Swiss-Prot record:
Alphabetical list of Pfam families matching this protein: FliM (PF02154), FliMN_C (PF01052)
CDD domains: FliM (cd17908)
Phenotype for residue 176 to R: Decreases binding to YcgR
Keyword ATP-binding annotated: no
Alphabetized InterPro entries for the sequence: CheC-like_sf (IPR028976), Flag_FliM (IPR001689), FliN-like_C (IPR001543), SpoA-like_sf (IPR036429)
Effect after changing residue 160 to E: Obviates binding to YcgR
Similarity field: Belongs to the FliM family.
Subunit structure of this chain's protein: Interacts with flagellar brake protein YcgR.
GO term, biological process aspect, one: bacterial-type flagellum-dependent swarming motility
GO molecular function: cytoskeletal motor activity
Gene Ontology CC entries for this record: bacterial-type flagellum; bacterial-type flagellum basal body, C ring; bacterial-type flagellum rotor complex; plasma membrane
Name this polypeptide is given: Flagellar motor switch protein FliM
Signal peptide: none
């Protein structure tokens, strides 16, 4: 019986051990609270690269569209390109006001559908300015549908936007922008297979006088992913088209240069002693040439025959000598 009695030290050890055992499940529970389920099908894709070429396209488009709005409204708008947002489609859709003009577009030959979204504030500003208003009587957004007049103004703005967006892509990768249809409710414009799919959204802020509006161009990332390398590493500004434009410009400038064409009929070799003995009235015999070679700055450029035309001496060109002149003539811009 005495052997079964525990000492105080043993009792304390058992008590401490029991408390440690009880603390362990608590620690594991707290650790489990930090664990969250991960579903690779619904998580946001990480796009770390900066889409530099798309930024260039957006800036060019803003310039084109600014000119188009000026011609439409006869007022000078100020268009600011916002930062490109790479976000899930549901985040983009839930921030859209009501009513909103949603225009579905194709960028052929890319697969997929994009959106050009005009906010109601931009539509009302355009309608007000087009009919001579100055914004003193703002239109209230009441969740209603756009009127026929507003829809016609939207169509005109959309046409300008699609033309400008197509032109903006030409220097990077030519695309054909095609209008599909228009909607007012975002539930009818599912441009992605899942609400969590990533889209590339570019906001544009339009300011006309004291009034501001906004529109967006939203493209599924899967749509432009085939051009990902091109969008991350844009071609140099001196592209082939720009090089050709520069070359044509240079050719035009060179062709307007003033040059002196010299046609020598004959050359006579004389010694210095003979030249010193020359007197007025002396005759120097020369051989009449069949053809004359004309020079520019000492460089032979053409062969010709000579004669008279309308009482003046003239040259009839037979052919160009310098091959550079032939190449310049072929490269002359139409």
């Amino acid at each position: 019986m005495g052997d079964s009695i525990l000492s105080q030290a043993e009792i304390d050890a058992l008590l401490n051990g029991d408390s440690e055992v009880k603390d362990e499940p608590t620690a594991s529970v707290s650790g489990e609270s930090d664990i969250r389920p991960y579903d690779p099908n619904t998580q946001r894709r990480v796009v770390r690269e900066r889409l530099q070429a798309l930024e260039i396209i957006n800036e060019r488009f803003a310039r084109h569209f600014r000119m188009g709005l000026f011609n439409l409204l006869r007022r000078s708008p100020d268009i600011t390109v916002g930062a490109i947002r790479i976000q899930p489609y549901h985040e983009f859709a839930r921030n859209l006001p009501v009513p909103t003009n949603l225009n579905l577009i194709h960028l052929k030959p890319l697969r997929g559908t994009g959106l050009v979204v005009f906010s109601p504030s931009l539509v009302f500003i355009a309608v007000d300015n087009l009919f001579g208003g100055d914004g003193r009587f703002p239109t209230k957004v009441e969740g209603r549908e756009f009127t026929h007049t507003e829809q016609r103004v939207i169509n005109r703005m959309l046409k300008l936007a699609l033309e400008g967006y197509s032109d903006a892509w030409k220097a990077i990768n030519p695309l054909e922008v095609e209008y599909v249809r228009s909607e007012m409710q975002v539930k009818f414009t599912n441009i992605t297979t899942s609400p969590n799919d990533i889209v590339v959204n570019t906001p544009f802020h339009v300011e006309i006088g004291n009034l501001t509006g906004e529109f967006n161009i939203c493209l599924p990332f899967s749509m432009i992913e085939p051009l990902r390398e091109l969008l991350v590493n844009p071609p140099l500004e001196n592209s082939r088209n720009e090089d050709q434009n520069w070359r044509d410009n240079l050719v035009r400038q060179v062709q307007h240069s003033q040059l002196e064409l010299v046609a020598n009929f004959a050359d006579i070799s004389l010694r210095l002693s003979q030249i010193l003995k020359l007197n007025p009235g002396d005759v120097l015999p020369i051989e009449k040439p069949d053809r004359i070679i004309a020079h520019v700055d000492g460089v032979p450029v053409l062969t010709s025959q000579y004669g008279t035309l309308n009482g003046q001496y003239a040259l009839r060109i037979e052919h160009l000598i310098n091959p550079i002149l032939n190449s310049l003539n072929e490269e002359q811009p139409k």
